[in-house]
Amino acid sequence: MNPAPNLILIGPMGAGKTCIGRRLAERFTLDFVDVDQAIVDAAGASIPTIFEHSGETGFRSHEREALARVLEGRGQLVSTGGGAVLDPDNRALIARRGFVVYLRVSVAEQLERLARDKGRPLLQRPDREQVLHDLAAHRDPLYRELADLILDTDPYTAADATAQLVVKLATQWQRQDLTA
């Protein structure tokens, strides 16, 4: 059993972090926190607007601050942005403050799930498939390094993925938020 004050979901866009995260939070009676939403709330601007005005570097700065703020808490299910693992300080904080679940998804499944999504700044290009392959090649080793548990979400609906995780977490994650 791995004791941790928070349950943290990592993985690429389209893996199901928000959808599965909400379901898991309800199942485990945890507060659901979406780091991307925390960024939007703190900045007072949408993620595409932040990217437009500050670039990816500016966005990552907002992300680092929001993640640090969120992970001060406990008893939360935290859904991170896909690129949160790029920063070594973020990785250290994530590892220290939670039980980390990597929701893996194939590029083919990402393309299907994100086909109509216009809110992803990194995908506002004609070569979406190549972008996703490049992101996966760079980020997958970082996700794997951090993960306490990995679930491939390709074959599952959000409900089925949640059910799979409930079973796996019952034997691997020890809640630490219920004491102190």
From Swiss-Prot:
UniProt catalytic activity: shikimate + ATP = 3-phosphoshikimate + ADP + H(+)
One GO term (biological process): amino acid biosynthetic process
Keywords assigned: Amino-acid biosynthesis, Aromatic amino acid biosynthesis, ATP-binding, Cytoplasm, Kinase, Magnesium, Metal-binding, Nucleotide-binding, Transferase
One of the record's GO molecular function terms: ATP binding
Main location: cytoplasm
Disulphide bridges, residue numbers: none
InterPro entries: P-loop_NTPase (IPR027417), Shikimate/glucono_kinase (IPR031322), Shikimate_kinase/TSH1 (IPR000623), Shikimate_kinase_CS (IPR023000)
Pathway the protein acts in: Metabolic intermediate biosynthesis; chorismate biosynthesis; chorismate from D-erythrose 4-phosphate and phosphoenolpyruvate: step 5/7
Cofactor: Mg(2+)
Domain of life according to the entry: Bacteria
PROSITE patterns hit by this protein: SHIKIMATE_KINASE
Positions contributing to Mg(2+) binding: T18
EC number per UniProt: 2.7.1.71
Cofactor note: Binds 1 Mg(2+) ion per subunit.
GO cellular component: cytosol
Binding site for substrate: D36, R60, G82, R139
Localization of this protein: Cytoplasm
Binding site for ATP: G14, A15, G16, K17, T18, C19, R120
Function, as annotated: Catalyzes the specific phosphorylation of the 3-hydroxyl group of shikimic acid using ATP as a cosubstrate.
Family: Belongs to the shikimate kinase family.
Assembly and oligomerization: Monomer.
Protein name as annotated: Shikimate kinase
